[in-house]
Amino acid sequence: MQSADSATQAALASGERTATHTTRLGGKDVTAQVESWQVERSYATDLPAAMRAFSGSSAAQLQLQLAGTGGDSAPELYSAWADHATGDLARPGQSVVHETGVGGGSTLAAFRGTLRNRSAASGSDTVQLTALDGAERLRAPAELPRPYTGLYWGRPLASATWCVDELLRQAGLLTSPPPRAPQFVAGQPLTLVHATLHGGFATPYGMPEDLPDPRHYTWSRTGAPHEMALVPRGLPGGETGITASWFPRSRVTVPGSRLLAEAWVNNAVGIGSTVRIDLELNRTGAAIGTISLALDFTQGTVLATSLSSDPQVPGGALQWGFNATAMQTQRGIWHFGAYVDVYASTNNQALPSVIPLLTAPDGSTWVGEPAVFTAASGPQPVAELRKVRLVTSMATEGVQVTSGLTALPTVAEFSQAGTWIKTAELDEAILPLRTIPKISGSQWDAIGQIAKASMSTAEIDERGRFRWRNFTRFATAPTAPDLTLTSVRNIAALTVTEEIDACRNFCVQPAKDWGAVRATAGDIVSDTVVREIPANGSLTMSYVFGEEELDVGPPDTDDDSVVTTGSSFRVATQNAAGTKAVKGAVDALVRREDGTIVLRLTNRTATKLYTVDQSGGPSIRIVPIRPDRDPVERQGVSYVPGSDSERFYGRQEFYGEQSEWVQDLGAAQQLAQAMRVAWEYPVPVLEDVQVLYDPRIQLGDVVRILDTTGATLDTLAWVVGISTSASAGGGVQQTLSLRGVRANGVPADAGLTPDAPALSPAPDTSATYAAVAAAYPTLAALLTANPTWGDVKDGAPA
C-alpha cells in the first residue's frame, strides 16, 4: 500500500470519502476543469481469473472528461484542430499526472503516463481524454543481444530477468547507473563495455567472452550496490576470485586511448576481500599486455600493474595505501575505478598513467596521485584492447569501460549523480539462458511474453515506477493483511466465484533443452574489395547476416605473425601485395543492425591505410557463429498421484506453452511445480467488490475480507484489479477484484454421497441359451421358423 499522511489516515478512519484530486496535463494544473475521472488497472493474462495474480502484465488507463475555461469551450481549446497554443496540452503523447486523496490530506499518486487519444464533441463543452501509463514508454522495437558465448562454454550467460532489465534500460527505465556514452559520436567518448550483472553477463555494449562455472556464483539482490549483483560462492582451484570477461564493442588502440574502467562492489557480501579489473591488450604475434587495477580490502591497498607475456618487455607495479584505514574498516558499497591514459606514443609504445578513484560507503571519494609507468617498468607496445576481465571475490555490479575521455572525470562525473533516476525494480533472477531468444514486437510486448513464460507479473505503479515480480513472490501465502475491509464498514457489495477451471493438479511445462548445443562457425563472409581508410578518418561497411546467426565481437587485427581463425582484418600503408602489416593503428567497432553486421574501422594515424592482405587481396573476413544443432524438447511435470485434489476434482491438466525462454529441464520442473502448488485447488475469486474509497490500495496488496452479512467469510486475498471513478462533485466509487491467497481447504463432502458420473449398465434382456433351446428344440424347428438374429437374441419366436 501507499503510505499516507496523518490527515489522510484520520479521514479514512472517520469514514470520510469525499475525493480530492490534482490533475496536470503537460505540467499544467487543470484540476478545476476535470468534470469526471476514472482509473483502471489490473493484471492482463489469458489464464483463468483465479490464476492471473501469478502471471501477466498490467497497463493502467485513465479517462478524463475535461471542460473549457475562460469562456472558451473545451472543443475550442483542446480538439485536434485547436490552436497549438492551447491544443498541445491535450495532444496524444502529452504527459499526464493524476493524484487523488480524501478529506484534507495530501493527495497520493494515482496515475502517471501519457495521453493516448482525445475526442471532442462539437457543440458541447467537454473533451474526452484517454491516457495509458508508463507502458507507453516501452513501445519502441524490442532488441536484445544474442551472443554465442553461452553455447561456446555450455553455461548460462543471461536470464529472463536480465532481458527484462535490458528492455527497460532501452526505454529509460533504469535500475542502476546507465552507460556513460552509449551512442557513437565521432570524437566523443564511447562505452566499450557496460555489464550490469543483473542476472547475466550479457551486455548490449561489448560481448561476454569468459563465463564462470555457475556452481561458483549466484545472483542476489541482497546487498547489491543498486539492484542485483554477481556474488561468488565458491572459488575455482588456485584462483582468488571468479572470472568473467568481455570483448569491447570497439577494439581501441594503444597508444591512442584514454580509458575509464570501473565497477561497484559490496565488500560485506561474498567470500573474500579482493577485486580486480584487467584491460587485456592484443599485441604483435601472440604477446599479450595487461593493465590492471586491484583492490584488497583486508590489506587496505590499491595496486596498479602493467604487465606483458613477452619476457623482453619489463612489467611494473605501483601501489597506493592512502586510504588503507577506510578500506579495512568500512563495510558496504564501494565504487572504484581507474583512469588509464595510454594516449601518447613514446618510441612506438605507451607508458601508462593510472589514477585510481574510490568512493567509500560513507560517501567519501579519494582520487589517487597519478602513477606513471616507465620504459624500464611497465611499457605497453602498440596493441588493441582485446578483452576486459573481472576477477572478484565479493558482490559486484556495473562493470563499465569507457574510451575517448579527454581528462580525469570529476568526483561528480565519476558518481554519475544527478544523471539518472532509479525507476524500476526487479526480482531475483530466474530462467537461466544459454542463448537469448529472438524477439519481435515492442519492448512491452517482449516483457509481456517473458512474464507469461516465467509466471511473473510486470506492472508500472501509480508513480510511474516499474515492478517485476517472479512467481516466487506467491510461493508462501501471506499471514497478515495490508488492510482489513469489513461488510459492516467498508464493503457495499461483493461476488464470490469458484470455478473448476482454476484447478490444475497435473501441470506440464515444455522446455527446449540447450544442454548439448554448442557454437560452431558458419560460412565465412569475406570482403570483395580492398578499401581505403582515410588518415584520421573512419570507414563503415555492412555485411548480410542470417537470423539464425549469433552476434560476434569486433575482428582482430592481423599482423602476419600468427594464424587468426576468427573474424579479422589486416591493414597496410599501400594497396599492394607484400606490404608490411600495420598494428595498433585502427579501432574496430562492430554492431548488429537490421539483418546486417556493421563494421566501422577508424584510422588513428595521419597516413592512409588499406584493408589488404599479404597477397594483395581484400583482408576483411567475418566468421559467423551459429548453434550446431537444434535444442531437444523436454517436459517438466508436477503431479501427485492419488492426491486429494484429484480425488475431489478429477485430474485437471495444465499444459504450459512451448517457450524459447525455458531452456533447461530444471527450470521447466520448477515452473510446473509452482503451477501445481498454486492451482492444486480452485481458489475463489472475489469480484465486483465495491468498497469505500481508499487511495492507498495498490495491485498486489493483501487485504482481509471480513463479511458477516452475506457470504460469511473471513479470508486474505490479493488485489488483482482496481477500478476507481469520480465525478466533479467529489463522489467516488472504488471496485476491487481479488484473488484469495489460498483455497478453502480440502472438501469434506460430509453427509454427502456423490452420484456416480455414469449410470450402471442396463439389465441384459437378451435370451439365454436355455430359452433359445426351448423355443427351437431342433434344427428343423429353427429352419422352419426362419427367425432373424434379432428374434433369436431377443427371445421372441417368429
Regions found by a protein language model. Name each.
Residues 183, 416-437:
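Short, conserved helix/loop micro-motifs enriched in His/Cys and acidic residues
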Residues 460-464:
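Short, well-structured active-site flanking segments
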Residues 1-406, 434-440, 444-455, 488-493, ...:
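Assembly/oligomerization scaffold segments
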Residues 34, 38-40, 138-155, 434-448, ...:
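Surface-exposed, non-catalytic interaction/assembly patches
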Residues 666-680:
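Stable alpha-helical structural segments in soluble proteins, enriched in small hydrophobic residues
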Residues 6-17, 179-212, 253, 442, ...:
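Surface-exposed fibrous attachment elements
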Residues 1-10, 122, 126-151, 298, ...:
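Acidic, low-complexity/disordered segments
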